[in-house]
């Protein structure tokens, strides 16, 4: 249930989505398995097993959404083996070579024949919609995070979520924190990554180290900048901040898990308590992090 990473998207104050309308739109984009000749498909599914009819699981000041994707897996080696067998059979029966164009057509035919019977790989991407504070927080990175926002946009256009921009770039801020003091509420953890400027610059990765040690700080003296930095927020959440303002290796510490467990042994109650607690904690963490980066920059 607990998110393991975080990609942030900003919702403008004057364009916070109506969750009821959004859920109605999501119902038009429910997940369905890929058909015979489709390579993949995606769509929304219920985030909570105990509420199978809800595509948006309501939380205090927000909701939880889940996007399911299914990709067919058809290894190139399988297609190649079948193709080689067919080519050999044709050449033996008809006593002629099989040309390049015919091989290409055979390959397409083989792919179409095998695709409906191919194995599938399933993935799920979850997002917290914090309409109270105006954030979409996705438990993914890169293209997967963008796919979630795009799917929400299709469900309720125009859904103007965008990447956030801060007064201080995460890279310059993290470099300053490693060289001096971290902002109130945060403390250095034990991992970081530093790079020399330029595309071909050297990279140094420190893991499970005291980041205040001279041998770590001396990399800053040679001109390297911090691209990833391990931080702990309020002794409650551990994470690695990246220069793209993504939170990796997100870990909710024992104090939060104990709070959630007080909801009891009932699975639905524990799910709701965990999701609500996670939304509230991430809401405050993101607010403190954006403030530590100088606040949001006007666009």
Where are these regions (language model features)?
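Intrinsically disordered, low-complexity, charge-rich terminal extensions
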Residues: 1-135, 139-299
């Amino acid at each position: 249930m607990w998110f393991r990473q975080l990609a942030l998207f900003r919702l403008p104050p004057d364009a916070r989505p109506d969750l009821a309308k959004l859920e109605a739109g999501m119902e038009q984009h429910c997940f369905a398995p890929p058909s015979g000749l489709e390579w993949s498909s995606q769509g929304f599914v219920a985030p909570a097993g105990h509420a199978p009819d809800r595509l948006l699981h309501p939380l205090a000041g927000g909701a939880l959404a889940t996007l399911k994707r299914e990709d067919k897996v058809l290894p190139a080696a399988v297609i190649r083996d079948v193709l080689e067998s067919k080519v050999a059979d044709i050449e033996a029966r008809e006593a002629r070579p099989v040309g390049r164009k015919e091989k290409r057509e055979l390959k397409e035919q083989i792919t179409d024949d095998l695709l409906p019977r191919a194995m599938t790989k399933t993935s799920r991407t979850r997002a917290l919609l914090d309409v109270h504070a105006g954030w979409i927080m996705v438990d993914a990175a890169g293209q997967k995070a963008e796919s979630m926002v795009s799917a929400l946009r299709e469900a309720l256009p125009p859904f103007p979520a965008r990447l956030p921009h801060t007064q201080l770039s995460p890279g310059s801020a993290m470099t300053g924190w490693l060289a001096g003091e971290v902002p109130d509420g945060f403390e250095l953890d034990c991992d970081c990554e530093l790079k020399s400027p330029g595309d071909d610059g050297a990279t140094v990765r420190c893991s499970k180290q005291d980041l205040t040690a001279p041998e770590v700080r001396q990399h800053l003296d040679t001109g390297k900048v911090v691209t990833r930095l391990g931080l702990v927020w309020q002794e409650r959440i551990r994470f690695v901040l990246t220069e793209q303002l993504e939170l990796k290796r997100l870990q909710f510490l024992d104090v939060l898990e104990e709070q959630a467990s007080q909801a009891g042994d009932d699975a639905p109650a524990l799910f709701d308590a965990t999701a609500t607690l996670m939304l509230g904690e991430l809401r405050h963490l993101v607010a403190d992090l954006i403030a530590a980066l100088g606040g949001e920059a006007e666009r």
